[in-house]
Design a protein with these regions (language model features):
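Generic detector of low-complexity/intrinsically disordered segments
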Residues: 15-16, 46, 94, 113
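Amphipathic alpha-helical interaction surfaces in cytosolic regulatory modules
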Residues: 22-97
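STAS-typified acidic loop motif
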Residues: 1-30, 49
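Non-catalytic signal-transmission and effector/linker regions of two-component phosphorelay proteins
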Residues: 1-5, 106, 112-116
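Residues that form or immediately flank small-molecule/cofactor binding pockets and catalytic motifs
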Residues: 8, 81, 105
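Short acidic-hydrophobic, aromatic-tinged amphipathic segments that line or gate anion-handling sites
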Residues: 97-107
Length: 116
């Protein structure tokens, strides 16, 4: 797995490439904590190049979601059907602090609305 940091409308965007599993989840969690330290109100993940996510990977998202300050949120962009199913199973899909976007443009639209 590789993690690349970019910004989308001033919000940290972690682009993940590869499987997120027991071996790679700690690196993802570290990158996410560094991005959260920027204190921008939310954190986005581009998951379009993530074919597989196991329970350790889901745990990273659960931990982040549970630690978000009120009004802050985590966004997942481009997750495949398997990842979306995992997010539903672990309960992330129904949490207001965890948002799922099909495309980057959808996340941009929400960020634009937030800025207004």
């Amino acid at each position: 797995m590789e993690v690349f940091q970019a910004f989308l409308s001033g919000i940290p965007l972690l682009q993940i490439v590869g499987d997120v599993d027991h071996f790679t989840a700690p690196a993802l969690e570290e990158a996410a904590r560094e991005a959260l330290a920027l204190d921008r109100g939310c954190l986005l993940f581009d998951l379009s190049a993530v074919p597989y996510l196991d329970s350790a990977g889901a745990g990273v998202f659960l931990t982040l979601d549970s630690q978000m300050a009120p009004g802050f949120w985590v966004g997942a962009i481009g997750a495949n059907a398997n990842l979306l199913r995992i997010f539903e199973i672990v309960g992330l899909g129904s949490r207001p602090s965890f948002r799922i976007f099909a495309r980057t443009e959808d996340a941009c639209a929400v960020l634009s609305d937030t800025d207004s």
